[in-house]
Amino acid sequence: MKKDVLIERIEELVRPIVSELSCELYYVEYVKENGEFYLRIYIDKEGRVSLNDCEAVSRRVSEILDVEDPIKEAYYLEVSSPGLNRGLYKEEHFKKYIGSEVLIRLTSSLNGVKSVKGLLRDVSEDSILVEGETEIQIPRDKIKAANLEGEI
């Protein structure tokens, strides 16, 4: 199964569980690190995500993944909050944090810089607007990584 199809399938399986437990599915990633596979599920909610939230989601998700078995190789399941310096992966993440301080790392130099730090001012389907020392319109396909900076 292709990785993006696998992630979609896992999101379909776990989203209802995460919602039942009063949390929001923030992001899912499946990676290989040092020869081991990791399924990482990031959850969020109003207020703070607690260790108990992560444990409850982990238990329930583990049960459904054991039954549905979408991943054929051995893997480690990790459930956590996305953290204060959370990654911004989807358009909805960018839109949620308009007005927040962000750090954007670029795939290649844009206007002589490889990273931009500033306030996220606007989001469109194909670009974001960040106000740092100057305003810069960044095409979405030039974003290597995007993270919140500081408190949310």
From Swiss-Prot:
<dbReference type="Pfam" id="PF17384">
    <property type="entry name" value="DUF150_C"/>
</dbReference>
<dbReference type="InterPro" id="IPR028989">
    <property type="entry name" value="RimP_N"/>
</dbReference>
<keyword id="KW-0690">Ribosome biogenesis</keyword>
<dbReference type="GO" id="GO:0000028">
    <property type="term" value="P:ribosomal small subunit assembly"/>
</dbReference>
<dbReference type="GO" id="GO:0006412">
    <property type="term" value="P:translation"/>
</dbReference>
<dbReference type="InterPro" id="IPR036847">
    <property type="entry name" value="RimP_C_sf"/>
</dbReference>
<dbReference type="InterPro" id="IPR028998">
    <property type="entry name" value="RimP_C"/>
</dbReference>
<protein>
    <recommendedName>
        <fullName>Ribosome maturation factor RimP</fullName>
    </recommendedName>
</protein>
<dbReference type="GO" id="GO:0005829">
    <property type="term" value="C:cytosol"/>
</dbReference>
<dbReference type="Pfam" id="PF02576">
    <property type="entry name" value="RimP_N"/>
</dbReference>
<dbReference type="InterPro" id="IPR035956">
    <property type="entry name" value="RimP_N_sf"/>
</dbReference>
<keyword id="KW-0963">Cytoplasm</keyword>
<comment type="similarity">
    <text>Belongs to the RimP family.</text>
</comment>
<dbReference type="InterPro" id="IPR003728">
    <property type="entry name" value="Ribosome_maturation_RimP"/>
</dbReference>
<comment type="function">
    <text>Required for maturation of 30S ribosomal subunits.</text>
</comment>
